[in-house]
Amino acid sequence: DFARAKETAETFFIVQTPSMADGNFDNKYLKSAFESILPHVKDKYHIFSIVSTVTPSSLENEILPIIKRITGKDTGNFGLCYNPSFIALGDVIRNIFYPDMILIGESDTKAGNILEEIHKKVYKNNAPIMRTNIINAEIAKIALNAYITMKINFGNLIGEICEKVKGGNADEVARIIGTDSRIGRKYLSAGTAYGGPCFPRDAIAF
């Protein structure tokens, strides 16, 4: 019931953004959700936080015009944030409560402050809160997943090389180079597969 949104001060949008043929993400469900909720919250200050993965500049070019058109308000009279999650399949609950970081792309400081306080009530570790503008957050989300994909592929490449060389041990090589603080040990194991709803499509989009 979209009308219940008027009872809240913040709305988090977690809807699917399917990949299109060109690699970009389709925001049709996201835009539809905004058009359904906005009429019920346009009379007061409200924070709209998008969790779904989007193509960079989506909030500026597609979402912001919808908010302004339906509410008749400009930025500052509402808060718009990009607040993507970084979760792994099979480890979702733990990733929510013990994240490596919280990323907040904010339209204004007020919205960012409120969103930060909400997260502090949820997570149970001392994860850093990275606050930036919206476009940098949009880029960072897919860049992070693309980098992890690249690292997995590199680990598998090490495995292929070690299989072709007598005495080669992929685990030993990964342990050695992973000791370097510039590289790290995570996702370097040979034979690691990648999949799920994020890595493949985010790599293509990037």
Which residues are covered by each model-predicted region?
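Structural/interface elements that position substrates and couple domains in central-metabolism enzymes
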Residues: D1-F206
